[in-house]
Structure formats: C-alpha cells, structure tokens
Amino acid sequence: MSAGSERGAAATPGGLPAPCASKVELRLSCRHLLDRDPLTKSDPSVALLQQAQGQWVQVGRTEVVRSSLHPVFSKVFTVDYYFEEVQRLRFEVYDTHGPSGFSCQEDDFLGGMECTLGQPAQKWLLQVVMRVSVDVLGPAGHCAKHFLCCTESSHLARTGPSFLLRYDDLCLPWATAGAVRWWTCRGGHTQGWQIVAQKKVTRPLLLKFGRNAGKSTITVIAEDISGNNGYVELSFRARKLDDKDLFSKSDPFLELYRVNDDQGLQLVYRTEVVKNNLNPVWEAFKVSLSSLCSCEETRPLKCLVWDYDSRGKHDFIGEFSTTFEEMQKAFEEGQAQWDCVNPKYKQKRRSYKNSGVVVLADLKFHRVYSFLDYIMGGCQIHFTVAIDFTASNGDPRNSCSLHYINPYQPNEYLKALVSVGEICQDYDSDKRFSALGFGARIPPKYEVSHDFAINFNPEDDECEGIQGVVEAYQNCLPRVQLYGPTNVAPIISKVARVAAAEESTGKASQYYILLILTDGVVTDMADTREAIVRASRLPMSIIIVGVGNADFTDMQVLDGDDGVLRSPRGEPALRDIVQFVPFRELKNASPAALAKCVLAEVPKQVVEYYSHRGLPPRSLGVPAGEASPGCTP
C-alpha cells in the first residue's frame, strides 16, 4: 500500500463551485514502473496535459507517491467535457526529484500515454489507443498482417509492417455508440466483434520513439459527475493510535475508500501525514458526493489508517467500515466515532479491542445547483435591450447607415436583437421586454436623452415579445434625431435599480439581462465602469454587442476576461458580468451560433450570483443557510 506525499491531495481539485460545464473526473494508478533510483524505488507523479491549438499544455499534476513502483494517486483531475470538440489528453509519468506538484528538469521520464475524451452510450470514458489487425493481400497472393493503432495524425504513417492511425479519425459509420469494433480484412471481406466500452482503461506506458517502458502500465478511471448534486466537507481526527515506531511515535495518515460494485476499492482521498502524533487531527477536505459514494448514501466506505514510512513500507494501524448515511446519522447524534481495528490482532488476541479510535470531527453536506435548477425552480429572466441612436450610425434614410431599414434584409441591430432576444424570451413567462434608446434627440422638445423608451411611453417601456421590440425600433427611427454622445451608464444604472429591488426579496425569482447594441466605444467610460462595478453585486448581466466596423479595442476593458474590472476609485467588481462581442466577427454566422456566443457566459453568471448570496432555487424550499449553489449542468 502506498501513501502520498506528506501533504494530502484533494479529490476534487479547485474551489467550489466550478464553472458551468459537463464534468469528468479522472483517477490514476500505475503498475510496474521503471525504477530510476539506484538506492531506493522511484518517487512517481503524473502530469496531465491537454492539447490546445496544436500545443500540449500542462493542466495539472498529481502528488508524489514516495518510493513506489505501483502508485495509486489520490489527486483527482476534473476535466471539462465538450461534445463538439476532440479533446486530446496526455499522461506523463515522472520519477520526481522536485517538490510535490511541480516539475523539475532533473525529473526522470518513466513513460506516457495519449488518448482522447469521449462520450459513448452516455457514459464518460477514455477512447484510447486501439490496435486493429488488417490482413492485406499482396501482389503474389501472399497475405501480410498489419496493425492500425492510435497516433497523433489522421494520415497513415508506415513503420515496418505497421500503419499508425488514430481510432477517432477513422470516422467509421459502423462504429456504434457504447462499443468499439475490431475488424479483420481479407481480400475485401470483413468480419468483426465488439469490445464493450468501459470506464476503466489500462494501457502500457511508452517512452520516446514509441518504445515500451518495460511492463509499465497506467490505469485511468473516468467517471461522469454531471449529475452530481452536491459535495461533502469532512474532517477526521484520531486518538490513542498504536505506536509503530521504536524511537518515536507513529506518523499517521488516513485513506478513505469507496467500495465499488465489483467489491474493489476506489481511493477517494488520502490525508496529509501528521508527524510523531498518536492523537492526530487531519485537515478538513472536500469531495463530491459522486466521488465519495457514487451519489448512493448506502454504498459501503472503508477507512484505513497507516503509519507513514519514507521508504514506502507503511505500517498498517487499523481500519473500519461505514456508509455516508451512517456517518450523517452518527454525526447528528454526536456519536461519530469508530474503533480502528487491525484484523490480525483481533484474530490473535482475545482481549484486543482496537488500535485506536477515529472520530468524524465535522461533516457538512452542500447542495450544488445548476442554471437549469434555477430556471426550473421558477427563476425568470427579464430582458432589456438598449439601442445606440447616436449620429455615428449614419442617417437612417441612407443605405450605408447601420440603422437603414432594408425591406429584404435586416440590419445588424435587428440581427443581434432577434438572435439574442428569441433565446431570452423562452425564459420569461410574460414575454414582455423593456426597450430603451440612448444618444438621440427625442420629441417633443428634441433634447438629448441617454435613457428613453423607444415606444415613447415612459410609464411602460415594455414591448410584447421580440416582434414588439422590432416594431417599436422601426417606428422610433423616423421620430428621433440621431445625436450623441455614446453614454451607457444611465441605462445600466436604470436596470440596476430594478435589479436592486429584486435583490431585497432574498429569493431566486428574477434575473436581469441588459443587451446594449452600440456602434462605437462608450464616451462615459469612467461612469460606465462605476455602474458595472455596482451592478456586479446585483442579479444582473450585461451583454454589449458592437455593430459596424469601428475599433472596439477600448471596449475590451469592460469585459473582465483579462482581469478584474475596477471602478475609477479602485473598487473591484464582485463578479464578471459583462460579455463584449464584436458583431462583425459573427455577421456571417447563423442566428443560433450568434446567440450561443453572445449568451455563453450567462448561465455561469446566474449561478455565481445565487451562489454568492447562498440562495437555492425557489421550488426546492431549502433554507438559504444550507444552500451551496454551484454549477453543474
């Protein structure tokens, strides 16, 4: 049995909640690794790399397992999954000489394995290197056996009697979901059989130039956690553990395992080592409910306690079994403790009671809510559109104007408005939208206004559906004089006042989206930054679509992708609530593609807001103090 480094490795990396994406958890173990150390065994760790734009980028690294050729890693990688993308992964195993979690030039490469992430039969797994035998009929009727297997390129590369081909690139129409077919070809005739796709994959490690790393293998277990509805925070301590050291006290650490359906043990978490202590208090840790018990509270769990040895020969102290259901009940009753039992001692000694006691010091269960949870719980999306009527758009009567109404083709304002609005209206029960304008002289006095209703009804600026907004926009154009400047802070502040009233209710009932359509950089940048920072604390998102061919470089500062937006006074935004999209980059895209790009960040922003406020979906009726919203689709 191997332990990790003296610092524990979390089973759910990163903070919670996570961003909105389908999630796959990857667990790693290796067998028969090469031994690069002359006096001791290798100290392995695994780096996970993901291919982005043709380059391999390291996204994480496991802990170091000291002095082990058969490591089981506690670190769990959580990978975002996108159905429409080919996501290439590479696992590299090193004999580590630097600090845990960091690469170092002196690290010895022990082998690697490449694969892709896939979704057959609605189960997450790794599509790995496949070897397909092919009998090719030679010119004299002689048959030569060839093998097709995964490589980086989609084209064939001949190496001796082998062809190298990535399985994903075969694009075979007969490859059914949930299975991989192996086919043998002879003289144009085919026969095949199925290998049922599994979530556990074991493959050999390869050195440079494709050489096998001895008998070394890596096992990757992939698990879908998209349906995960919570995470658990646990804290353990122990008392009166057996002393396994002659001249000092034990150095205990604890391992928590889940018992799988095949009765095999899956490592969930490994604590840090507490030095020279028979009454250790281990640091609290978080694991997803899926990782802990596959979201089955009655699934058996097993805890093992060890005395750490730097050479990897850890001394077994004891163990106990439980379930998450039992842990919750015992903790509520104040009796969450278990005898730490060594079965060998129990069998040999009649008077033996235990090798110490393990106590569950703290248990917190946090529900995790998704964007759909809030929508299905009754949260309404209120949509407001603000249209730029400044003179820089050009005279609407001129066909070169961005506001020109062509009877045969919508202008850019209408394209953006309809594409985004048709999506938003599906989340609003009354289908009524506020429609505002800015930068124009309006009747009757023709004074410049940066906040006017385009239906010219200041008491009710809402229109019936997106078609009502389109009609109000078309009717408004001949009645106003395009002017300036491009001030948007007044409209942001107006919507923010409505959102502030909603915030005071303490319910997840209304969320506000402000769509600003403009042809240039805003003039009141300082006031706009101030208004956005204030709005970041409210149930509100802002989407800015730049129409026309102006230089929108300065607008990127409002989108917090390059850093936290700050007000002129230096106050940071609580959340990134602004998405800026230049329309010219999407003008030839379909309405669906435009809407997808423009609205991509909204689900995440909705969940982040309610997560910060600790508000559950309304229909669930969970007390706010118990809610821990997160983002799992």
Swiss-Prot record:
* Residue span(s) of domain C2: 2-133, 212-339
Checking SMART domains in the record gives:
C2, VWA
Concerning Gene3D superfamilies, the annotation shows:
C2 domain, von Willebrand factor, type A domain
* GO BP terms: cellular response to calcium ion; lipid metabolic process
Q: Which UniProt keywords are present, listed alphabetically?
A: Calcium, Cell membrane, Cytoplasm, Membrane, Metal-binding, Nucleus, Repeat
Q: Which residues form a coiled coil?
A: none
Taxonomic placement: Eukaryota, Metazoa, Chordata, Craniata, Vertebrata
Source species, please?
A: Homo sapiens (Human)
Q: What does this protein do?
A: Calcium-dependent phospholipid-binding protein that may play a role in calcium-mediated intracellular processes.
PANTHER family registered for this protein in UniProt: COPINE, COPINE-7
Q: Can you tell me where the transmembrane regions are?
A: none
Q: Which gene encodes it?
A: CPNE7
* Classification via CDD domains: C2A_Copine, C2B_Copine, vWA_copine_like
Q: Which cofactor does it need?
A: Ca(2+)
Principal location class = cytoplasm
A single Pfam family, by name?
Answer: C2
Say if the entry is tagged with keyword Repeat.
Answer: yes
Q: Which GO terms describe its cellular component?
A: cytoplasm; extracellular exosome; nucleus; plasma membrane; synapse
Q: Which family does it belong to?
A: Belongs to the copine family.
Query: What InterPro entries does the database record attribute to this sequence?
Result: C2_dom, C2_domain_sf, C2B_Copine, Copine, Copine_C, VWF_A, vWFA_dom_sf
Protein name (Swiss-Prot/TrEMBL): Copine-7
A Gene Ontology MF term for this entry? metal ion binding
User: Does the record bear Calcium in its keywords?
Assistant: yes
Where in or outside the cell? Answer: Cytoplasm; Nucleus; Cell membrane
Tissue specificity of this protein: Expressed in the brain, testis, thymus and small intestine.
Q: Which residues bind Ca(2+) 1?
A: D245, D251, D307, D309
- Ranges for domain VWFA: 382-581
